[in-house]
Amino acid sequence: MTYCIGMRLNQGLVFLSDSRTNAGVDQVGTFRKMSVFENPGERMLVLMTAGNLSISQAIRQIVAEHIDSNGLSIWNVASMYDAARIVGEAVRTVHQREAKALADCGIDFNVSIIVGGQIGAERCRLFQVYSAGNFIESHDETTYFQIGEAKYGKPIIDRVITPASTLDEAAKCALISMDSTLKSNISVGLPLDLLVYEAGSLAVTRFVTIDEKNRYFRMIRDTWGEQLKSVFENMDNPVWDVAPGTDGRSLASCSTAGKPVRMTMPAQLGNTAQPTTPMQSLAQQVHNGRQH
């Protein structure tokens, strides 16, 4: 499995991917999921993939090399929309070629793609491409896309990231999101590829491969866990024995719906409730047993 995230901000774009693939606990490998298509001063595009590795690699190769009947390729299209369309066509090409053989072996055609970047004077744009080759574009209401194991790292992004977030803030948030995923899912793993793109530069602004020795990421992992525990411990525990509305910590409900749903025992079973007896300590149970 894998986890990749792309963010579109007013200042530019941030991309982060892991590099783990696995086909079982004893078949774990490292394959980089991020590819860069760059012609400095003219265009800079990033493609990240999740899903079946052979499908992903085939799509990436077609995107890099294919020129259509109109002479268009990822290297010369005039807009990011057309770039996303070329990626979608590559997905369909691989599907047409491989899907039946995969299905005959019981393997689904499974791939998800994030592609984003900037071409010429056009604004930065970010797309997610699906297994059918169709795609959607991010907007201010949805400033990021995730593929792969997305659920663990989603909450922090939803709470923190807006179009006005800085590139450094977004990079930090992406790393925290990845740390949450690494903590909860062993199918995602180091090293990570982090790329930061500043709008208008038309070249990679910053790039780093992060392994277990990276001091900043180690600080993120330690500090984030400690701060979460600190915030949790400093929050008040719920209060149960006060009237509703008299204390902000009260969990008591004013609503009559605040009761459990109790099921009715079938009448033919009668009353089988056992009489309650005081709880005994283990020592008392042993002592009572010796009296028999």
Label for each model-derived stretch:
Residues 1-292:
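N-terminal nucleophile
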